[in-house]
Amino acid sequence: MVVNAQAVDNRAGTLAAGGTITAKASNALNNDGGLVEAGGHLDMQADSLSNAGGRLRALGSGGESRFAIGTALNNDGGVLEVASAALTFDTPALSNRGGVVRHLGSAGLNLDMDLLGQAGGEFITNSAVSLSAEEWVNNSLLQAASILSLIHI
């Protein structure tokens, strides 16, 4: 399923597809209290994405689920659950207070360490996680099923 729009409003709604869901919004993508579920992976591109109290799910185990968000991704109280091999966040701001990011894949959770530390909530992955930064203040729970390394540069 491909959705191209200026804005996408799925508040308390449902978007579901047996394969990949690609959503491109030049403005906001709002899934507050809603459900977006792909049988494949998720490719979400928007200026902002709000999933407060919502659920974003990618059930397929192959490929990469990607969240390329221009300004901010809000997953406060939400669940972002991805079985895709890789999960990548490309956003300058991430809020996950009371939220859960669960990655079941094994090819990597890609997230800027500064975003992870300040986001809050839980980040759980079956993948290895390697983090590097000059300084890190952690307000999140991070659980990795594989080797977890923290490198001070």
Predicted regions mapped to residue ranges:
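Short "repeat-start/strand-capping" segments in structured domains, especially the N-termini
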Residues: M1, A16-I21, V36-L42, L59-E64, ...
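GD-rich hexapeptide-repeat beta-solenoids
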Residues: N27, L42, S48, S65-R66, ...
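Conserved small/polar residues in nucleotide/adenosyl-binding loops
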Residues: I151-I153
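Short, T/G/N/S-enriched strand-turn elements that build extracellular solenoid repeat scaffolds
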Residues: R11-A16, N31-E37, A52-L59, D76-E81, ...
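Hydrophobic lipid-interacting interfaces of membrane-associated proteins
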Residues: Q6-V8, S26-A28, D47-N51, G70-A72, ...
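Extended, compositionally biased low-complexity polar/Lys-Gly-rich tracts
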Residues: M1-V2, F67-T71
